[in-house]
């Protein structure tokens, strides 16, 4: 690594970060098993991974696992507020190029994404590990701009303005960079619902030039990280941000997918009276039969003490909704991007910063709302994200996906796919001992009776867990 090929808040935080990484390793059996299984064969030897995913203690364990099995890695955060500065310092201190500071600007955010593709030897990355598809979008938009730079002329948002400026800057410094980089990519593995939606859209438009593995829809990711992770980290973020009593409050959760289910359970477990909004009749029926009142935000916003978005969509909480809420209503997002809440519509109102990632926005009539993490992920902005154990399952899927793409890319088409069921079951199996779980074993006769092998896979691909 070149001299100081990193950007962190304070490299002196490395020792603190290392202590927490050591603890996290004891809670991440899947990643530690990957190190043990693949340390000799080194399946990622020669892999040059550009990673864009929240720089946390748990991500540090992922990065060090990728390196332990042969990969070279450069890393940036996928959110301006999610970096844990001591984790970033600990990663940088080991010689990994890492770029992230909690509270970085949008300009810095896109500069850091650019940096994960700038290797000291000048050669390109051959894999992307993404969270929200920003790194993928950077390369693909840049390669299209090298053909037609007019696509960068009219940014629609402030973030897009910085995004386009960074592409223009790189095009000027390194002509042809994006096309060369796009051609070198074997594939991308994507962590989140939002990123997967972007990849499917690229596939639909014929703009996906390499294979993409949808890690998000591995059962051991979506049914665990999205649900059980949010169940623990949502209330943690609200409490750290506000110190407000949740019991007895009325909370509205927008969306009842896996993230919404975990969020509703988190709030109801803390004693809140939870209401759900939904567009999908199946999810709405699930919410109703789980005991929640299913409402529309138009009707129910005025009753809310807390509103949480979980949808991955845009304009879920609009300005007209925010005008209806109670004074000092807490407003936050645990979906992905900050456009679930119309934060841009609040920018011309008075903001009072209470502490990092906690602001009070005041309306002309004197009503105030407490906005967490400026509408970005509150569980990472106001707290430290999901616990290590559940992230071990998600990140073990990422490791296996990167191995698949690097060693078997020719078996994948330029489309979005999920990991095979056998690997999903493997990830689950790696986490059972830590919880003291003992599996029953099918006899040969039982296995034949239900049409499987005693070793699995035990469910068809269409099975819904």
From Swiss-Prot:
Keyword set includes NAD: yes
Lineage: Bacteria, Pseudomonadati, Pseudomonadota, Alphaproteobacteria, Hyphomicrobiales
Enzyme class (EC, first level): hydrolase
Residues that, per the record, bind substrate: 56, 131, 191, 221, 225
Listed pathway(s): Amino-acid biosynthesis; L-homocysteine biosynthesis; L-homocysteine from S-adenosyl-L-homocysteine: step 1/1
Co-factor(s): NAD(+)
HAMAP family membership: AdoHcyase (MF_00563)
An example molecular function term from Gene Ontology annotations: adenosylhomocysteinase activity
Pfam families: AdoHcyase, AdoHcyase_NAD
Keywords assigned by UniProt, alphabetized: Cytoplasm, Hydrolase, NAD, One-carbon metabolism
Record field: catalytic activity: S-adenosyl-L-homocysteine + H2O = L-homocysteine + adenosine
Main location: cytoplasm
Top-level taxon: Bacteria
Protein name: Adenosylhomocysteinase
Cofactor remark: Binds 1 NAD(+) per subunit.
Family of this protein: Belongs to the adenosylhomocysteinase family.
Cellular location(s): Cytoplasm
GO terms classed as biological process: L-homocysteine biosynthetic process; one-carbon metabolic process; S-adenosylmethionine cycle
Keyword match Hydrolase: yes
This protein's GO CC annotations: cytosol
Function: May play a key role in the regulation of the intracellular concentration of adenosylhomocysteine.
E.C. numbers: 3.13.2.1
């Amino acid at each position: 690594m070149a001299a100081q090929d990193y950007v962190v808040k304070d490299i002196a935080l490395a020792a603190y970060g290392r202590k927490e990484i050591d603890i996290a390793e004891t809670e991440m059996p899947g990643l530690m098993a990957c190190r043990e299984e693949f340390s000799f064969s080194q399946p990622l030897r020669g892999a040059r991974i550009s990673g864009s995913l929240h720089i946390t203690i748990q991500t540090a364990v992922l990065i060090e696992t990728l390196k332990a099995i042969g990969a070279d890695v450069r890393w940036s955060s996928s959110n301006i507020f999610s970096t844990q500065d001591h984790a970033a310092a600990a990663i940088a201190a080991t010689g990994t190029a890492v770029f992230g500071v909690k509270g970085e600007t949008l300009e810095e955010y896109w500069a850091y994404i650019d940096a994960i593709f700038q290797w000291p030897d000048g050669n390109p990355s051959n894999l992307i590990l993404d969270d929200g598809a920003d790194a993928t979008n950077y390369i693909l938009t840049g390669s299209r701009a090298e053909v037609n730079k007019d696509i960068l002329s009219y940014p629609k948002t402030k973030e897009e303005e910085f995004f386009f400026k960074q592409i223009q800057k790189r095009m000027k410094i390194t002509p042809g960079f994006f096309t060369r980089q796009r051609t070198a990519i074997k594939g991308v593995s994507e962590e989140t619902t939002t990123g997967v939606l972007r990849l499917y859209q690229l596939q639909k438009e014929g703009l996906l030039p390499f294979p993409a593995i949808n890690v998000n829809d591995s059962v051991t990711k979506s049914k665990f990280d999205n649900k059980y992770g949010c169940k623990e980290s949502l209330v943690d973020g609200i409490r750290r941000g506000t110190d407000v009593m949740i019991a007895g409050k009325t909370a509205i959760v927008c969306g009842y997918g896996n993230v919404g289910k975990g969020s509703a359970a988190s709030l109801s477990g803390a004693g809140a009276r939870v209401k759900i909004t939904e567009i999908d009749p199946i999810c709405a029926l699930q919410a109703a039969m789980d005991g929640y009142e299913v409402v529309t935000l138009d009707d129910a916003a005025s009753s809310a003490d807390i509103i949480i978005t979980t949808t991955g969509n845009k304009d879920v909480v609009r300005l007209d909704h925010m005008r209806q809420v109670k004074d000092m209503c807490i407003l936050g997002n645990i979906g992905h991007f900050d456009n679930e809440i119309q934060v841009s519509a609040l920018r011309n109102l008075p903001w009072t910063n209470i502490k990092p990632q906690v602001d009070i926005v005041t309306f002309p009539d004197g009503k105030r709302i407490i906005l967490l993490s400026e509408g970005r992920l509150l569980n990472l902005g106001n707290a430290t994200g999901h616990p290590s154990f559940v992230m071990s399952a998600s990140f073990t899927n990422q490791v296996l996906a990167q191995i698949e793409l690097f060693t078997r890319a020719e078996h994948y088409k330029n489309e979005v796919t999920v990991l095979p069921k056998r690997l999903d079951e493997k990830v689950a199996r790696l986490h059972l001992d830590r919880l003291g779980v003992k599996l029953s074993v099918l006899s040969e006769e039982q296995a034949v009776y239900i049409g499987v092998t005693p070793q699995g896979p035990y469910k068809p691909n269409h099975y819904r867990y």
